[in-house]
Structures are given as C-alpha cells and as structure tokens.
Amino acid sequence: MGRAFQNRKESMAKTSDQKAKVYSKYGREIYVCAKSGGIDPNGNLALRSLIDRAKKDQVPTHVIDKAIDKAKGGGGEDFDTARYEGFGPGNTMVIVDCLSDNPNRTFGDVRTCFNKVKCKIGSQGSVSHMFDHSAIFVFAGTDEEAVLEALMMADVDVTDIELEDGKVTVFAPHTDYSKAKTALTDAFGEIEFEVDEIQFVAQNTTEIQGEEVEQFDRFLDLLNDLDDVQRVYHNAEY
C-alpha cells in the first residue's frame, strides 16, 4: 500500500444544504485562483485543475462561470489564505486551510471547532512539519519508468512514483506542480487525471477507533460546515 493521500470525496454532500455549501466553497476558490493567476484555464493550470475537480464533484457550470466572471471584473471581495494546525481527537494531526475575508472571525470559528471536541488549536508549524506539501497526480498507466523519464527530462524533482492496479501515482514538491503537469501532458497527451492537486500528505498515520472515530468524524463535520474552510488534511487512519 502506498502513501495515504486524502480522498476529498470522503464526505460526500448528501443534502441540498450540504451541496450548496460545497458549491460556495468551490466558487470562492475558483474566484481567488482566477483573480490571482488569470481567468484563462489554458494559461492557469491551477485554475484548470480546480475547474476539472469541481465538475467531477458535480458543481453546476453556472457556479463556475459566475466565479470566473467575477474575477474577470476585477472587483469583489478580497480573500486571504489562512492555515491553522493542531491536534484532533485521538492525538491526530490536523491542518485546516481557509480562504477568509475576516481572519479574526475565521480563527475564532476554527478554534471553537477544536474546543467542541476537547482539543486545542496549535501554533503555526506545530504539526505541518509532519506532512509533505506535495503535488499529486493519479492516472491510468502501466509504465512508471516512462513517467519518471518524462518528469526527469523536465527537471521535476520527483518525490515518489507508485504503480498499483493499473494506476500511476506521482508525488512531487508542490512548487513543481505546473512543471510536472505540463511534462505529463506533453509526454502522454490529454491524460484523464483521477487526482490532480496539491495536498498535505502525512508522513505517518495515527490509528483511531471506537469513540475517537465518532469524535473525529464530528470534528471534521464541524470544520467542513464553516464557510471559510476549504480543505482539511489529517493523519487519522480508521
């Protein structure tokens, strides 16, 4: 078994309220990405990846278009990135990435989630040193040597390549995301990526069970219910 990167479909939105919240989070992230990196997905690979991911998660086209149009206008809110770290139920390590127009409010909201499960938010760097900030690509394939050669020819600092069940998984530093994706598409054409994003990948996992699992799931629900929270990374295994 390979590295345990997060599957962002762990908690699928089942109700209309949950779906609306997912759409809102994607809309905000697409807006920020387009505003900072350009509205053309062909020139902004991060935006292209984000749009593809939104479509896979069944985000309506009008939500995506509205966010890009908003970025095109140059107006709208200013969102800042905010990252919080700490220890969750069962001494698990957690990183919470946010986009916020009011960092003080966001910090208070995230801290309340920790407090509700009798855990404490930590200082910056308290757990992130136990995660690798990685670009991750997963796609169908059988020849990891050819993949490695293509990436090395493009001077990508490959962290790891795994081959399992007819799928190739590539790990590279997050700073090499664009370079790695360009190298893969140049070498192998229009790849249909199962995973194509930047994540924090835990170096080690913490196994939880029983009541700890219930508390941890509640903790994730509390965090994901916050409008400002975009992604939650953790090292829990259960």
Curated annotation (Swiss-Prot):
It is found in: Cytoplasm. GO terms for cellular component: cytosol. One of its GO terms (molecular function) is DNA binding. It comes from Marinomonas sp. (strain MWYL1). The keyword Cytoplasm applies. Its main location: cytoplasm. InterPro entries: Integrase-like_N, TACO1_YebC-like_2nd/3rd_dom, TACO1_YebC_N, Transcrip_reg_TACO1-like, Transcrip_reg_TACO1-like_dom3, YebC-like. HAMAP family: Transcrip_reg_TACO1. This is Probable transcriptional regulatory protein Mmwyl1_2868. Coiled coil: none annotated. One of its GO terms (biological process) is regulation of DNA-templated transcription. Keywords: Cytoplasm, DNA-binding, Transcription, Transcription regulation.
